Amino acid sequence: MRLVVAAVGRVKDKPLRAAMDEYLGRIRRYVACDEIEIQDGPPAKVGPLLARASAGASVIAMEVGGKALGSEAFAAGVERWGSRGKGVVAFLIGGADGLPPDVSAAADDRWSLSPLTFPHRLARLVLIEQLYRAMTLLRGEPYAH
């Protein structure tokens, strides 16, 4: 399985970037995981870049209105989507205005991290942490804090 986190916007905040890098490193002990940052811009420009970043993958749009999943269901969903096709699962996070509607509509599934609205950079950290948690759950390992 390979995971892709494609997100609009660059994370410049050093502590936030360090936390993301820590969890990405932990995920990579289990599976390949790429993070792709896409420059923010109008939907007509961002949409094709997100589509290219997720080409050939099962695509999960991360949105407030998506399916609300607990950690166990999230892990099971990662495993289910990862076992299909090429074994690549791409998680898409939009910018401040969310994902372009055509990108959301083309996704294979839509998930939510919370009914709360997070700044998109914080949502990316929460997603990456949940992907690490999913890896530990799928292997029956204790979660390393």
UniProtKB/Swiss-Prot annotation:
Alphabetical UniProt keywords: Cytoplasm, Methyltransferase, rRNA processing, S-adenosyl-L-methionine, Transferase
EC number of the protein: 2.1.1.177
Single annotated GO MF: rRNA (pseudouridine-N3-)-methyltransferase activity
Enzyme class, UniProt record, top EC level: transferase
Cellular component, GO annotation: cytoplasm
Keyword Cell cycle: no
Gene3D superfamilies: 3.40.1280.10
One Pfam family linked to the record: SPOUT_MTase
Reactions performed catalytically: pseudouridine(1915) in 23S rRNA + S-adenosyl-L-methionine = N(3)-methylpseudouridine(1915) in 23S rRNA + S-adenosyl-L-homocysteine + H(+)
Top-rank taxon: Bacteria
Subunit structure: Homodimer.
Family classification: Belongs to the RNA methyltransferase RlmH family.
Function: Specifically methylates the pseudouridine at position 1915 (m3Psi1915) in 23S rRNA.
HAMAP family: 23SrRNA_methyltr_H
Protein name in the entry: Ribosomal RNA large subunit methyltransferase H
Organism: Sorangium cellulosum (strain So ce56)
